[in-house]
From Swiss-Prot:
Protein name: Phosphoribosyl-ATP pyrophosphatase
Family: Belongs to the PRA-PH family.
Main location (coarse class): cytoplasm
EC numbers for this chain: 3.6.1.31
Length: 121
């Protein structure tokens, strides 16, 4: 990720954060925040489904730009969700950096071991 890309994510996250106390009649993001957890999480599900459908369309000759647009929608709504739960893109980036260099199998085994240890096992 380039510094410019990270800056874009952080700028967008700052705008989203600024909408937390905003007027739900004036801002889509403020409206989602105002509606609460279920509305934010439902939107993530809807956007994820649209990504899957767009990806399938690309395999059948659909426009790759449609997939990019749907992924952008999903990422945006994931940023809204992170903000809603008082998290930031930096938290996700830190987790990705922590996982970097680990195989998926190795990372999953470490996660399961940590879960067992946390549960007293």
């Amino acid at each position: 990720m380039t510094q410019s890309t990270e800056d874009t994510l952080l700028r967008l996250a700052a705008v989203i954060d600024s909408r937390k106390g905003g007027d739900p009649e004036q801002s889509y993001v403020s409206r989602l925040f105002h509606k609460g957890d279920d509305a934010v999480l439902k939107k993530i599900g809807e956007e994820a489904t649209e990504v899957v459908l767009a990806a399938k369309d690309v395999r059948q000759g659909g426009a790759p730009t449609a997939l990019v647009g749907e992924v952008a929608d999903l990422w945006f709504h994931c940023l809204v969700m992170l903000s809603h739960f008082d998290l930031s893109p930096a938290d996700v980036i830190a987790e990705l950096e922590r996982r970097e260099g680990l195989s998926g199998i190795e990372e999953k085994a470490l996660r399961k071991r940590r879960e067992r240890e946390a549960n007293g096992g």
